[in-house]
Regions:
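Residues lining hydrophobic/aromatic ligand-binding pockets adjacent to catalytic sites
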Residues: 1-148
Length: 148
């Protein structure tokens, strides 16, 4: 079950394979078949998806573009839905999905969160788990910076 998870917090995060290049028709078809009431965020792992036409397609469907940090992926600060979803994979370019964000980095992300909130968006931030426990520490620090 989902014990301890608020029902309004449930949604779907869809991740595209890093070899899956842009296919607007396929994305449009897929998103058009999802229930309108289920919040959806899409994480693209191929650079070809990062363009205004795809952002417009996501906006039409109310789907969020997943803003990413780390993992050698482009960090594009774009909100396409009533909520923003940020996936923080870790800042260490030598350690995939690892490392700890600095206090300065987390303050920078807190400012982005506040900007999206000022636009009336809910913001969800996910820190990629790692064996060193950095994700938990970073999430707690970000929450403290935001006063939550």
């Amino acid at each position: 079950g989902h014990d301890g998870v608020h029902p309004d917090a449930l949604g779907r995060v869809l991740q595209g394979h890093h070899r899956l290049g842009r296919d607007d028709a396929r994305l449009d078809y897929f998103l058009s078949r999802l229930p309108w009431w289920v919040p959806v965020a899409v994480e693209f792992r191929h650079d070809s998806w990062v363009c205004d036409e795809v952002f417009a397609l996501l906006e039409r469907h109310g789907a969020a573009y997943v803003v990413m940090s780390g993992a050698g992926l482009p960090c594009v600060l774009r909100a396409t839905a009533p909520f923003a979803y940020v996936r923080l994979h870790g800042p260490d370019s030598d350690w995939l999905y690892g490392g700890s964000y600095s206090e300065a980095d987390l303050h920078w992300w807190a400012e982005r969160v506040r900007e999206w909130q000022a636009q009336g968006r809910d913001v969800y931030a996910y820190f990629n788990n790692d064996g060193g426990g950095n994700a938990v520490r970073n999430a707690r620090t970000l929450r403290a910076i935001l006063g939550q």
